[in-house]
Regions:
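Non-catalytic tandem-repeat scaffold regions and their flanking low-complexity/translocation tails
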Residues: 22-402
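Bacterial N-terminal signal peptides that target proteins for export
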Residues: 1-10
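Bacterial N-terminal signal peptides
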Residues: 9-20
Length: 402
């Protein structure tokens, strides 16, 4: 299901402030409560106000005046327009109704005709209940929903609300009992992001590091790998520090690339320096190639300049491999020349095989001409010529007159 976007989160924060202000104002005013029909009419009018500031202020004011007696009136206004009404209009009402009558709110949300709004409403109702009232009750509601998409929506709301509580150990135990699969993965991702946002990255790290290494259905591994990828986009240097604590641990394998790629988006030179600081292994090799590929797409000129200045070694080899593969379709001759710059003979020969096979299928004569002039051993030259011929049909023999 679609999760709330960052812009929606900003609206939610704005609305929360507006609701708090309006509630305080309402408590000090002598205005009488709205009945069901008055609430329906007021909401129907509010959702059509074109000015955004006035629109949001009016919606927040009405949500602050919602009671168990008039909540159905708000729902009566939303129901005919549910397909087009915006989620930030629904959000304060779902929360306010859940506060005064969670069962009625959830029941009405499940009747909405729009599937996307049903999912949104279920997530927000369960979230608000878990956040403000009773995690145990939120669990009962969430677990009572059996339709797959809505069940996922409910569990996401439960994870988000629970993750803002003081009972993260209880959340760990619960996640450990959830069947492994997409729903648990979504819950873990949402819980990680929520803890990082509201309690800070260090609290997220403390929570995951405190999970048992074994048991809970491999929760620690899943939570760590997911959180590392999430935090790498927010603060790659912080993520790199966390990853360094578990160098060599099986559950942290193949995660160098998860830090390197987001870091490349921010500062490829820093990402490259970090890769150079690590002991070279298969993880670093893969990350170096992937980092180089990303950098080439972002700024090929800067990448080429950095490559020319790079120190000899296996990371430079990985960068040369990535550059060669980038060039192979548009400039196969340049790709082959680049492959010759790879220091490792094994990697150099493997890359030449791949390039010449690809080039030979499209332009066997040009590939053969390059091969004739390349500084290669006779044995390798003949092997590569045979590969070209096997994929393109008969070609002139190496060294034959043209």
């Amino acid at each position: 299901m679609r999760l709330a976007t960052s812009s929606l989160c900003l609206f939610a924060l704005l609305l929360a402030l507006l609701i708090a202000g309006c509630e305080g104002k309402e408590r000090t005013s002598a205005g009488r409560p709205l009945d069901r029909e008055e609430m329906r009419a007021a909401v129907a009018e509010a959702i059509r106000i074109p000015d955004t500031v006035e629109h949001l202020a009016r919606i927040a004011d009405l949500a602050g005046r919602l009671t168990a007696e008039n909540a159905e009136g708000a729902a009566d206004a939303f129901d005919p327009e549910i397909a087009w009404v915006r989620e930030y209009d629904l959000l304060p009402f779902v929360h306010a109704w859940t506060r005064v009558d969670d069962a009625a709110a959830l029941r009405r949300v499940l009747e909405w005709s729009s599937a996307s709004k049903r999912g949104f409403g279920v997530t927000e109702a369960i979230y608000y209940l878990a956040l403000n009232r009773d995690i145990a009750k939120a669990r009962v509601h969430a677990e009572s929903i059996t339709k797959p998409r809505l069940a996922e929506a409910a569990m996401i709301g439960l994870a988000r609300g629970w993750a803002q509580s003081d009972d993260l150990d209880g959340l760990s135990q619960y996640l450990g009992r959830v069947e492994q699969g997409s729903i648990r993965d979504q819950m873990v991702r949402v819980a990680n992001g929520t803890v990082a946002l509201y309690a800070g990255p260090d609290r997220l790290r403390e929570w995951i590091d405190g999970m048992p290494a074994e048991g809970l259905g491999g929760l620690r591994t899943r939570a760590f790998r997911t959180a590392l990828g999430q935090m790498a986009f927010k603060d790659p240097q912080w993520a790199a520090s966390w990853l360094s604590d578990f160098a060599g641990e099986p559950f942290a394998s193949n995660m160098v690339v998860a830090v390197a790629l987001p870091w490349t988006e921010r500062d490829p030179h820093e990402a490259l320096a970090w890769l150079h600081s690590l002991p070279f292994d298969d993880d670093v090799a893969v990350a170096s190639r992937r980092m180089a590929t990303r950098w080439i797409r972002l700024d090929p000129a800067a990448f080429a300049l950095s490559l020319e200045r790079a120190e000899e070694g296996r990371i430079r080899d990985a960068m040369n491999e990535a550059f060669a593969m980038h060039l192979v379709k548009s400039a196969p001759g340049a790709a082959a020349d680049r492959a010759l710059q790879i220091d490792s003979s094994e990697r150099r020969i493997d890359m030449l095989r791949r390039i010449l096979e690809t080039w030979g299928r499209r332009e066997p004569e040009a590939a053969t001409s390059w091969l004739e002039q390349a500084d290669l051993s006779d044995a390798l030259r003949q092997e590569l010529a045979s590969r070209i011929q096997s994929r393109s049909g008969p070609a002139r023999a190496i060294g034959a007159s043209r």
